[in-house]
C-alpha cells in the first residue's frame, strides 16, 4: 500500500512542505558562510530542512557535509566521524577519498567496508586516536581541505547535544570553539533533538559556544500550511 504521508523520519522532495522562509534564510546563511544554530523540539523537521537547502545550493564551490553524531560517545568517536564525513563529502568517488586520506592524514591507514545492499554507500574507518593526531589537527582538517581545493565547506552536525554528554565535555567544547572560530573557509550548522541541552550549549553565557552563530528556533508548521499538502494526497 502506498503511503500518503511519512512520519518520524527526515523527508525530501514532494514530501517536504512549507518552511519557505526558513529554507531561504538558511540557504542565504550557507552561501554567505554564516554559522547557524537550529533549536527546536524533536520532529520539527530540522534534518529535512538542512537536506532541502543542500539540494537547492548549486554552487560547485560550496560543499555541504552532513553528519549525525547521535552514537558518538567520546571525543575521539566524534573526531573519527567528523574526519570521515568531511573526506567523503569533499571527494567525488571512493578512490579520491582514499587519496585525500593519504594527502591530508598521512599517519593513517583507512579501512573500507561495504554493505551487502547494492545501493548502500561504503563506510570508512580511520582509526584516529590520541597517538596519531591531536584534537586541534582534526578540528582544523576542513579548513586545510577547503584552502587546498579552493572551496567553502559547510559542516552540518545533527544531534550536536551529544557533545555536552561526553566525558570532560567543557574541555572538548573549548577546543572546538578555539579552532572553529578562526576558520575562514568553513562554516557550521549545528542542530539537535534535545532542545534544553542545545539551549544550554548555545545560549548560556558561561558556555564556550555562546554566541557562536545565528540561532534560529523552528516552530511547528501552521495548520493553514498543512492544508495544501493534505488536499493534494
Language model regions located:
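Alpha-helical scaffold elements adjacent to nucleotide-binding pockets in ATP/GTP-utilizing enzyme cores
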Residues: 52-53, 78-85, 175, 197, ...
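Short, basic/glycine-rich phosphate-binding loops at helix/coil junctions
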Residues: 1-9, 113-124, 153, 209, ...
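Short regulatory helix/loop adjacent to the ATP-binding pocket of P-loop NTPases
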Residues: 195-213
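P-loop NTPase nucleotide-binding core
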Residues: 40-44, 48-153
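Conserved small helical "lid"/interfacial subdomain of P-loop NTPases
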Residues: 218-233
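Conserved Walker B catalytic segment
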Residues: 124-194, 203
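A short, basic N-terminal segment
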Residues: 1-36, 41
Amino acid at each position: 500500500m502506498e503511503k500518503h504521508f511519512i512520519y518520524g523520519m527526515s523527508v525530501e522532495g514532494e514530501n517536504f512542505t512549507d518552511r519557505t522562509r526558513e529554507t531561504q534564510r538558511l540557504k542565504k546563511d550557507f552561501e554567505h558562510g554564516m554559522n547557524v544554530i537550529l533549536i527546536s523540539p524533536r520532529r520539527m523537521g530540522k534534518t529535512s530542512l538542512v537536506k532541502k537547502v543542500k539540494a537547492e545550493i548549486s554552487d560547485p564551490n560550496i560543499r555541504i557535509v552532513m553528519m549525525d553524531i547521535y552514537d558518538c560517545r567520546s571525543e575521539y568517536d566524534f573526531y573519527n566521524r567528523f574526519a570521515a564525513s568531511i573526506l567523503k563529502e569533499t571527494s567525488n568517488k571512493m578512490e579520491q577519498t582514499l587519496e585525500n586520506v593519504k594527502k591530508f592524514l598521512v599517519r593513517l591507514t583507512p579501512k573500507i567496508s561495504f554493505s551487502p545492499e547494492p545501493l548502500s554507500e561504503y563506510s570508512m574507518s580511520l582509526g584516529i586516536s590520541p597517538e596519531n593526531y591531536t584534537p586541534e589537527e582534526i578540528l582544523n582538517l576542513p579548513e586545510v581541505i577547503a584552502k587546498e581545493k579552493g572551496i567553502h565547506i559547510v559542516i552540518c552536525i545533527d544531534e550536536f547535544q551529544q557533545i555536552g554528554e561526553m566525558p570532560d565535555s567543557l574541555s572538548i567544547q573549548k577546543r572546538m570553539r578555539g579552532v572553529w572560530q578562526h576558520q575562514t573557509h568553513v562554516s557550521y550548522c549545528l542542530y539537535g533533538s534535545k532542545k534544553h541541552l542545545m539551549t544550554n550549549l548555545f545560549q548560556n553565557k558561561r558556555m564556550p559556544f555562546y554566541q557562536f552563530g545565528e540561532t534560529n528556533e523552528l516552530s511547528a508548521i501552521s495548520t493553514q500550511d498543512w492544508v495544501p499538502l493534505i488536499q493534494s494526497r
